[in-house]
UniProtKB/Swiss-Prot annotation:
Family recorded in the similarity comment: Belongs to the influenza viruses NEP family.
GO biological process: exit of virus from host cell nucleus through nuclear pore
Subunit structure: Binds M1 protein. May interact with human nucleoporin RAB/HRB and exportin XPO1/CRM1.
Comment field (misc): Average number present in a viral particle is estimated to be 130-200 molecules.
Naturally occurring in which organism (per UniProt): Influenza A virus (strain A/Mynah/Haneda-Thai/1976 H3N1)
Chief localization: virion
Upper taxonomic lineage: Viruses, Riboviria, Orthornavirae, Negarnaviricota, Polyploviricotina
InterPro entries reported for this sequence: Flu_NS2
Pfam family, one: Flu_NS2
Protein name as it appears in the record: Nuclear export protein
Location(s) in or outside the cell: Virion; Host nucleus
Length: 118
């Protein structure tokens, strides 16, 4: 379940002390939360049976927003890969591996939802 996975990853990331990069980590946590909310809102639009008109009226630039979210995901994936390369701490490695896996799942879910809305 990606909801509990999100909570687990966010909790684990918030426990990490990455020294000078804790600001970066907080930024990543914020982006994770933002992506989760975005994924959930797309899912709700799909649940209302392809409620594209509602989505468009609420946010006329939803395609732009979708593109921006994919950019955020790509950036986070690169950031996770970079962190995996530089960390020696196994707790951090496991956390970043799980976060990376979760990002890939969320990217796929957002892609699936957006295809259903087009």
């Amino acid at each position: 379940n990606t909801v509990s996975s999100f909570q687990d990853i966010l909790m684990r990331m918030s426990k990490m002390q990455l020294g000078s990069s804790s600001e970066d980590l907080n930024g990543m946590i914020t982006q994770f939360e933002s992506l989760k909310l975005y994924r959930d809102s797309l899912g709700e639009a799909v649940m209302r049976m392809g409620d594209l008109h509602s989505l468009q009226s609420r946010n006329g630039k939803w395609r732009e927003q979708l593109s921006q979210k994919f950019e955020e995901i790509r950036w986070l994936i690169e950031e996770m890969r970079h962190r995996l390369k530089i960390t020696e701490n196994s707790f951090e490695q496991i956390t970043f591996m799980q976060a990376l896996q979760l990002l890939l799942e969320v990217e796929q879910e957002i892609r699936t939802f957006s295809f259903q809305l087009i």
